[in-house]
């Protein structure tokens, strides 16, 4: 455990001599290289000399991390050559498995691999069902929108991530038949199970905003969204093109993936325009660009501690707050917002519009016997077990777990689900309880992140606050390294392979 904390500590270390490395690709214009005061450092006295001697160049990160990465690789060696999982051929014959996992996203891969690593399953005992050809690291699309990552670098072929010991059905799901312990695939085949894990994520409904699909598809429009692979790289080009006018960033009412993401791209765009001389936070009225945040929610963030910090930041930086403004239509350069309680709709003119569409459960989940009234898989908030069918489980975005829908949440949900499922297979009572942990590394500018961590009830549960006594509501450069470098690396290196448990570190 000490090794893992040392690794994380290196990402927490202040890199004050390299402000330019945080600038957006084309916005490294004339940024004044001012040194951050020692009051913002985590350990200003003990490591000042170490910083001077060894950390003058940002590339030293790789040199310092090398022995730790090597030690981790030795502890969890990868096969020098691995065979690909093969998709099951089309056949009308019913197949049976001990566990069927519906979904090959973050939750599906983490859970299926954790089950396999238990050593209790033979070849084809576990089946994974997913129609996708590619797996995407979706939290990275914010960085694509900010111009610091490419979307191609953040995806992997699905077959490369599926262990060859799994039976992989590269198909959609037609129906759930929980009374018969089976599902039907999109091609009509039937698959039987002893236990079912339903983790297909949620769908993004671009059609929920009238005119949005057409605006996104128009290469000449300055309308974009970080929430899709086909649109996330359009975001930065729109930010670059805007020289003056009104920029509006939206967030819908209701459930979405990572409720902090709509703000992340706002703050990165603001910082870009600030560096380009197009926005002055201290005097926004005189700036060529005006910035508004239109959210269907009543506040900046649902967790009170971080919501207060972000509201103070909004006011300090001169961003207009349009609360309980839910985008319903885009027509040319006009955006129309619904208001609560029958109030009259509001129409605003824009020159740039970043849209977060409404989201919700897939129809094959919503219309099934597994769903609650809202359409999510109805599970116990602690055990992740279905409230009606004892051999059905769910986690992640598709579940009814009343917490934020983030990849970080899955790092805590998956071990609980796997532990309880295995005990259930042995005829034992479930005894692991999920506490609602979730996290949102909220980028507040190029080079700084506010690291929100919380559990059920909106109560902060801060990893580094506990370890080092720091306030994670204060944006820090060290957290930016986690967001930009560490999290994408550990995601594909460990999380989807079932060996990363978030704040608890690596697992066997």
Predicted regions mapped to residue ranges:
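Beta1-alpha1 glycine-rich phosphate/pyrophosphate-binding loop at the start
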Residues: 90-167, 255-304
């Amino acid at each position: 455990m000490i090794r893992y904390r040392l690794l994380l500590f290196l990402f927490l270390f202040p890199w004050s001599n390299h402000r330019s490395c945080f600038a957006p690709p084309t916005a490294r214009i004339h940024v004044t290289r001012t040194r951050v005061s020692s009051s913002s450092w985590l350990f200003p006295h003990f490591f000042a000399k170490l910083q001077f001697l060894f950390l003058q160049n940002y590339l030293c990160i790789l040199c310092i991390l090398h022995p730790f990465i090597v030690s981790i690789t030795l502890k969890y060696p990868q096969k020098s050559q691995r065979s690909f999982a093969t998709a099951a051929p089309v056949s009308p014959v019913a197949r049976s498995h001990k566990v069927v996992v519906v979904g090959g996203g973050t939750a599906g891969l983490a859970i299926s691999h954790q089950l396999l690593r238990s050593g209790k399953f033979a070849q084809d005992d576990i089946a994974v069902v997913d129609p996708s050809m590619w797996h995407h690291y979706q939290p990275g699309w914010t960085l694509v929108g900010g111009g610091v990552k490419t979307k191609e670098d953040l995806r992997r072929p699905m077959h490369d991530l599926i262990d060859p010991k799994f039976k992989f059905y590269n198909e959609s799901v037609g129906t759930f038949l929980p009374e018969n312990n089976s599902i039907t695939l999109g091609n009509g085949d039937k698959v039987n199970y002893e236990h079912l894990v339903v983790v297909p994520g949620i769908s993004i409904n671009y059609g929920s905003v009238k005119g949005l699909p057409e605006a996104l598809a128009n290469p000449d429009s300055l309308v974009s969204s970080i929430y899709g692979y086909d649109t996330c790289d359009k975001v930065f080009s729109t930010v670059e093109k805007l020289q003056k006018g009104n920029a509006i960033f939206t967030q819908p009412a209701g459930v979405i993936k990572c409720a902090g993401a709509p703000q992340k791209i706002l703050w990165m765009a603001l910082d870009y325009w600030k560096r380009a001389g197009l926005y002055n936070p201290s005097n926004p009225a005189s700036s060529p660009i005006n910035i508004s945040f239109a959210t269907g929610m009543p506040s900046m963030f649902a967790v009170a501690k971080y919501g207060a910090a972000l509201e103070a930041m909004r006011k300090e930086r001169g961003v207009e707050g349009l609360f309980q403004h839910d985008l319903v239509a885009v027509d040319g350069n006009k955006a129309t917002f619904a208001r609560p309680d029958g109030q009259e709709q509001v129409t605003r003119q824009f020159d740039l519009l970043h849209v977060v569409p409404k989201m919700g459960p897939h129809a094959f989940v919503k219309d099934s016997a597994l769903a609650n009234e809202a359409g999510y898989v109805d599970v116990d908030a602690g055990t992740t077990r279905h409230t009606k069918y004892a051999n059905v489980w769910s986690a992640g975005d598709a579940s009814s777990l009343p917490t934020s829908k983030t990849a970080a949440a899955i790092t805590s949900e998956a071990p609980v689900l796997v532990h309880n499922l295995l005990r259930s297979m042995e005829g034992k009572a479930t005894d692991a309880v999920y506490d609602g942990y979730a996290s949102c590394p909220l980028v507040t500018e190029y080079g700084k992140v506010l690291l929100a961590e919380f559990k059920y009830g909106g109560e902060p549960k801060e990893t580094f606050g506990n370890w080092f006594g720091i306030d994670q509501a204060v944006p820090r450069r060290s957290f930016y390294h986690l967001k930009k470098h560490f999290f994408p690396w550990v995601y594909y290196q460990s999380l989807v392979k079932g060996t990363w448990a978030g704040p608890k570190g690596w697992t066997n």
